[in-house]
């Protein structure tokens, strides 16, 4: 059984994230989506809300588990005996940054590899930052996020 972890802040989870999760769920026995509390970011949704939104978005995927965490990713990887770390990469800038993290995580986890998955073309431009920006400027994000996220955003706008 191969267990992978897909960490991120997911603020909010987008259809680009869902693309990576769904494809990972086909490739691996178990996928843990790890929603991070990042003190250096000011989130639109708090950690508990983000965990719930991811859970609602992946409910149809039997081999996907969602957790929240505020620890070093390497500690979570070791504690849960994770086989690999999944990272989505859209651009060469993403790849350079993620390569650095992959080297550090390999060192801190005694060899756990990071696997890079590019999103399918239709989601290559989507990011949580872009979704938040469009939403905060009253734009339509309905085609960019799962239904649960759209409902939460609409509720937040009222």
From Swiss-Prot:
Site-annotated residues for Transition state stabilizer: 17
Gene Ontology terms: cellular component: cytoplasm
Superkingdom of this protein's organism: Bacteria
Pathway(s) where this gene product acts: Cofactor biosynthesis; coenzyme A biosynthesis; CoA from (R)-pantothenate: step 4/5
Subcellular location: Cytoplasm
NCBIfam families per record: coaD_prev_kdtB, cyt_tran_rel
Enzyme class, UniProt record, top EC level: transferase
Residues annotated as binding substrate: 9, 41, 73, 87
Official protein name in the record: Phosphopantetheine adenylyltransferase
Cofactor: Mg(2+)
SUPFAM superfamilies: Nucleotidylyl transferase (SSF52374)
InterPro entries linked: Cyt_trans-like, PPAT, Rossmann-like_a/b/a_fold
């Amino acid at each position: 059984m191969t267990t992978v972890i897909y960490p991120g802040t997911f603020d909010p989870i987008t259809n680009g994230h869902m693309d990576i999760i769904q494809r990972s769920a086909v490739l691996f026995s178990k996928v843990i989506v790890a929603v991070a509390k990042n003190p250096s970011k000011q989130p639109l949704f708090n950690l508990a809300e983000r965990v719930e939104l991811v859970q609602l978005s992946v409910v149809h995927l039997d081999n996907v588990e969602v957790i929240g965490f505020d620890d070093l990713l390497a500690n979570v990887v070791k504690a849960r005996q994770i086989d690999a770390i999944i990272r989505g990469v859209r651009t060469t800038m993403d790849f350079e940054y993620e390569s650095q993290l992959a080297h550090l995580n390999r060192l801190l986890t005694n060899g756990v590899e990071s696997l890079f998955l590019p999103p399918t073309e239709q989601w290559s431009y989507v990011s949580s930052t872009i979704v938040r920006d469009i939403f905060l400027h009253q734009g339509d994000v309905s085609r960019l996020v799962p239904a649960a996220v759209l409902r939460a955003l609409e509720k937040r706008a009222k």
